[in-house]
Amino acid sequence: QHTVVLDDLESPWDMAFLDNGTMFFTEKCNGLSVLMPEGEVNALLGMSGSEGYPSSEGDLFCEGQAGMMGVAIDPDFAENHRIYVYSTSNMSEPHTNRLMRLVVSDDFSSVSDRTDIVDDVPYKMEASDHPFGGPGAHNGGRVRVDPDGNLFLTTGDNHNEKLPQSPTLMGSKILRMDTDGNAAEGNTPPEGFDLRTYTYGHRNVQG
């Protein structure tokens, strides 16, 4: 037996909950929305090509396994109304994946104050000879908060054999950071590795 909470979604990707049941969720090719406890859905932030959002970020796009993915809630949300959203961006060449920090309005009708606290996670620009090997493949990426209030961010290997063991390229990793995107205290990566690195050598972490 099951209860349908929402339907007619397009590629729903992630959810994050407040204690009162408020649910932030992403649709990979549409954007960020929130389901309120009373059942009302507020669209918050769209991306290139999406419609029905009060604001959109034109650099955010969807291709293959890439798009708007992980979402997490700041441990001090009651005070700062911050959330974190991981999305693919064409703001730079080559394109990258970015972890954005956003501020939710008091009435949960909009977001503002975008700050990209991570902007250097690789994105697969071209197709390769792999199963499902098109652009955007093996792109990660989940965001979660640990008990100490730090952020975990998971990234994919882009079908690129150089990424898993690279000390400086942030694909194929789990990153652990504070809420400003800096390396979290207690990280112990091997010498020469980016200090945000928590674990490395992964295929396409999404859990």
Where is each model-derived feature located?
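Acidic, Gly/Ser/Thr-rich repeat motifs that build Ca2+-stabilized beta-propeller blades
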Residues: 1-162, 207
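Short, conserved glycine- and acidic-residue-centered signature motifs
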Residues: 64, 136, 167-170, 198-201
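Extracytoplasmic/periplasmic beta-strand context in beta-sandwich domains
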Residues: 115, 141, 172-173, 196
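Blade/loop signatures of beta-propeller domains
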Residues: 1, 108-111, 180-191
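Repeat-solenoid scaffold signature
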Residues: 194-207
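A structural motif
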Residues: 144-151, 171, 176-185
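Beta-propeller blade signature
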Residues: 97-107, 167-180
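Short, well-ordered junction/capping motifs at the entry into regular secondary structure
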Residues: 159, 189-195
